[in-house]
Design a protein with these regions (language model features):
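Phosphate-coordinating loops and pocket residues in cytosolic domains that bind phosphorylated ligands
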Residues: 26, 170, 179
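Residue-level recognition of oxygen-bearing side chains
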Residues: 49, 160, 173
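GST-like fold's C-terminal all-alpha helical module
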Residues: 71-170
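Long, charge-rich low-complexity segments
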Residues: 180-191
Length: 191
């Protein structure tokens, strides 16, 4: 989203993670997305690093104003830890059935969700009355969490958080970056 909003000129390559192109693995052997190769050859392969780099190049919406790095760190650390174990229980617990969820991790994530909901009961956005990169960095993870058990999510005691999430999911910039792209392969030239 930050790349899109910043107006950065880049080539988007859509891949299937189970069939990673050799060129991707050459650029970033860890084999995760994103992989962004700057003009000088430097590779950025962490989402947060890439977003911050893009916004430092151009921040037309002022998303870095009021950015709360500590709140994003809580999201990327403890919340993501519990989200992954809630959503993908069988990856972390050999006794969990495929597709099972881990309610103990949902409960731990709910503590963080409650804190976010409390913020949003006071303000329109996580750090105040203006949207900034804190909101943009966090909402995709809340979207993932909400999609695990949608009926539960709709009944959960987080109305302000649900409204905030709906606003972000329906935003034009999000719809633009979620547009489907054709699959890319090493045999192709730039898209």
């Amino acid at each position: 989203m930050a790349l899109h909003v910043s107006g950065a000129d880049y080539e988007h390559r859509e891949i299937i993670l189970r069939d990673k192109p050799d060129s991707m693995l050459t650029a970033s052997p860890k084999g995760t997305v994103p992989v962004f190769i700057k003009d000088d050859g430097e590779v950025i392969d962490e989402s947060l690093d890439l977003a911050l780099w893009a916004l430092k190049q151009a921040d037309p919406l002022g998303w870095l104003n009021g950015y709360d790095a500590a709140l994003v760190s809580q999201n990327d650390g403890p919340f993501k830890h519990h989200l992954d174990r809630y959503k993908y229980a069988s990856r972390y617990d050999k006794d969990a059935a495929r597709g099972a969820v881990d309610y103990s991790h949902r409960a731990k994530a709910e503590i963080i969700l409650s804190q976010l909901n409390q913020r949003l009961e006071q303000h329109s956005y996580l750090t105040g009355q203006t949207q900034n990169f804190t909101d943009i960095a966090i909402f995709p993870f809340i979207r993932q969490f909400a999609a695990v058990e949608t009926d539960w999510w709709q009944a959960a005691p987080f109305p302000a958080l649900r409204e905030w999430l709906t606003q972000h999911v329906n935003a034009d910039f999000f719809k633009a970056v979620m547009a489907k792209h054709p699959l890319w392969s090493d045999q192709e030239i730039a898209i």
